[in-house]
């Protein structure tokens, strides 16, 4: 499990490639949402929303994390375990109205990822008044959306129109057939960040005044195109 934490200077967008996980997210109003995610699912956590990620089953869970700021830093990521480790036991006892000795075996430093038991399945019909969900869900099932089929492949996009909570990020899954080309284009209102999952591709970026750069990409590579560049 990736234990409860939040990011002070960036929102988080993710696409699940393989495996399954359970997300718990708490917004600043104290409303919480618990959802299971699988391949093709997308999550979005606005800046400051606390969240944890727990693996499900016996398989690994692989997902791509993207942050909406190039200034994202672990120094602006705040962990609940780190905070508790830095807080005197006497203060914790008053905070949670528990005996001081309750905290004797708490970690003495941040726990980034912890191994734990596989959680039970979520109830299909939660007990009445047991949930306090936020008005907008943090999950979008992009893999279940019917893609646009074109002669050179398929294209599936999720924007804020589809996923209202995702105010600062849009995402797309582009699958190109062998030797197919994504036609010349540009985005006037956003930068483009790319992650290559399978296959190989070549991209040329045009920056005006005769400037261009061409690079080849393969699995695990990242591409970036500034706003307005062709």
Show which residues each predicted segment covers.
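Histidine-centered metal-chelating micro-motifs
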Residues: 2-3, 22, 41-43, 47-52, ...
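Ligand-binding loop in jelly-roll beta-barrel domains
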Residues: 11, 38-39, 47-74, 218, ...
